[in-house]
Amino acid sequence: MSDYPKTPQAAHLTALVELISSSVNEVISVYSAAGRDIPSLDSLEEGFLETPATTPPGLRHARQIIEAACAQLCVTIAQPGDCIVNKAFAYTESACLQVAANAKISDFLADKPDGLHTEELAKLSGVDAGKLGQVLRFLATKHVYREVRPNVYANNRLSVKLMSSDPVSCNVGVCTGELFQAATAAWDTLSDKEYGPSYLPTKTAFRKVHGATFFEYYETHVRLNLPRFSGAMVGWGNITDRGLLPQMYEWQRLEPGATICDVGGNNGHATLDLVKEYPMISVIVQDLESLRPRWSDLWARELPDAIQDGRTSFVPIDFFRDIPVRNCDVYYIRHILHDWPDASCVQILRNVKEAMQPSSRVLIHEYVLQQTTRDDVTVENDSAPEPLLPNYGNGRIRRYYQDITMLLGLNSKERTLQEFIDIGAQAGLKFVKLWDGGQTALVEFSC
């Protein structure tokens, strides 16, 4: 490299390559220290260090750097027209994932290490062999499935996540189904004189396509789509850092008997992990009365002692109208505010503030977005090293996918730290600290 002039752009490329190299060495080092090999794409075994809860921060950071730097390197050296057209063709990947998941191809390939021919898969799935072959060839080209020999496909490390027994497949079903359909109306909605300026949940791309709001849709399609949506929420928790909650905050500083109010907590699945780790904590789960049986079933199955000794309870709430249980030590709000526009979020937080005692804390557990300019770099925000985009670009892209999903589905959004601080201030709350979990974060407030 030293034989060539060190132009600014050459230095940019070299810096990206060095980031990739050093981060790959970090990945190798972590696995080596654990006495394990890095999993092959062809492997079907449960991977080591595959979940957020088991991934050391250094490995998580290295993975994000590699994803960010590889993507930035590719778009820097490729022809611009190629890049844009390939991005526009991204719908084909969603379409093929939809076919593979709905046809249960990964299920049929379970326990078939030598693979099955597309003719056999066609008989099992009911999809035409020629067309199925096109779909699987595309997915294998994208490293989903492995072509053992011409037209014979086997599962690999990625395709096993499409098995119907894996909740991630429910995520794929929702994303490539009703959300994919809603995305086709993005321009029609944003350019519509009535829908475009509105932030009402009744004026969304989702409603334009499906004739119902996001939540109405799942209420009226209970038999077909609600179970899949519920499974998708489990899958979402598995691939985000729900399991990291016990590690994300200084829970040990709470006094024995401290009470966490899980506002809008559904069945309390997130705070269940917390009580398992810190049995001196009590949890009050608050959500709609209709969710009480789900809370009872989950806790009775996973931690029955907590019900028997009163370390968990369920108190119904409409968080827009009702004040949560008063004088709790922590009010925990997970993936609730991203469903709602700012005014609605302020109302929820005002009700929470009304319930707080002077020592109480609010913990908002959400994605925290960053801008792509270094003007947004703050002490609180974990920013990527140069020459990467400060928000890690492709290394943290899923939170930006989610942001657009909330826009199209609910007229809402994921928020930056400043946006959280602003809605907190409108509710009378004071920002304390950002606790970064690697993917999501806890935004802490006092009253």
Swiss-Prot record:
Keywords: Lignin degradation, Methyltransferase, S-adenosyl-L-methionine, Transferase. The active site is at H338. S-adenosyl-L-methionine binds at G264, G265, D287, D318, F319, R334. One of its GO terms (molecular function) is protein dimerization activity. Its EC number is 2.1.1.-. One of its GO terms (biological process) is methylation. Optimum pH is 8.0. S-adenosyl-L-methionine-dependent methyltransferase that preferentially catalyzes the methylation of 3-OH phenolic compounds like isovanillic acid and 3-OH-4-Met cinnamic acid. May play a role in promoting lignin degradation by methylating and inactivating free-hydroxyl phenolic compounds, products of lignin cleavage which are known inhibitors of lignin peroxidases. Belongs to the class I-like SAM-binding methyltransferase superfamily. Cation-independent O-methyltransferase family. COMT subfamily. This is 3-O-methyltransferase 2. It comes from Phanerochaete chrysosporium (strain RP-78 / ATCC MYA-4764 / FGSC 9002) (White-rot fungus).
